[in-house]
């Protein structure tokens, strides 16, 4: 399951964003750090609904993404200085980061210096970069000691870290830089924050007219009216579409956020179907049939023979697997087949 960490300065509305993501469709639990909250969010997908209506299975399972509302950001002063990289230890395990930036006026919730989304985004990015710099400098110091006593195996790592330090000191997020395979492997071990895929959510209200600043290269941005979305979620489900239409909102906030996270992480959904269960699975775009088999169960990947594949839309159009097979819409694919978004798979394997 992919994890997305939610960060934001105080009074930015990041907890409201998590409430929108939850909206009764997932489950929540306290995290490990003070005031962290974890939400397992069901990914809405009308294809799952339609497949479930077709198969009438005993169980229907949607894809899931875990969101972590972190208490780490916004402590650049005494707490950050005392804690250093440990303050962000839980954040580093996430696959991507979602930064909530305040872009609304509310006298009841004042903010020092006034509302300035460009400033707040710079401050949040600076926290991530400073945290990465602390990690890199600690490692450079350790390797330097080893090199001084004649241990040469750390020379390559030391050179890479020196490059990283230069980039970070220049306040350049690592996600905007190019790294070779060896460097990428090294970076994965450090779980540096400024390398992670980044989604910036500008939290506006219905009166906001400001065009939000660009988040930089290798990052996505979207505008969300979090307070309004929370009010809509509080309505009975049957009343929500009409209310959204009246306000001119084409898409609900949950779908908007999930779709952005899928794009950010390069994810697709594939399905397994049958009378016992209809289930959605996530996979990275470009991964193959063996990767998909491994998502279902490692035994399927180890014993993989072939994958029987049919596009979800074709299966629904046919009305059954038998009719899809009659129309030659089911096909067998080998281990190198790149799974497409919406594929229904049945894995054939050696037991």
What do these predicted regions represent?
Residues 1-107, 112, 118:
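Conserved G1/Walker A P-loop phosphate-binding module
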Residues 2-22, 36, 142-351:
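C-terminal-of-GTPase-core extension/linker across diverse P-loop GTPases
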Residues 15, 41-48, 64, 81-84, ...:
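Amphipathic alpha-helical transducer elements in NTP-driven molecular machines
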Residues 41-44, 71-81, 92-154, 167-179, ...:
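Conserved Switch II/interswitch segment of TRAFAC-class P-loop GTPases
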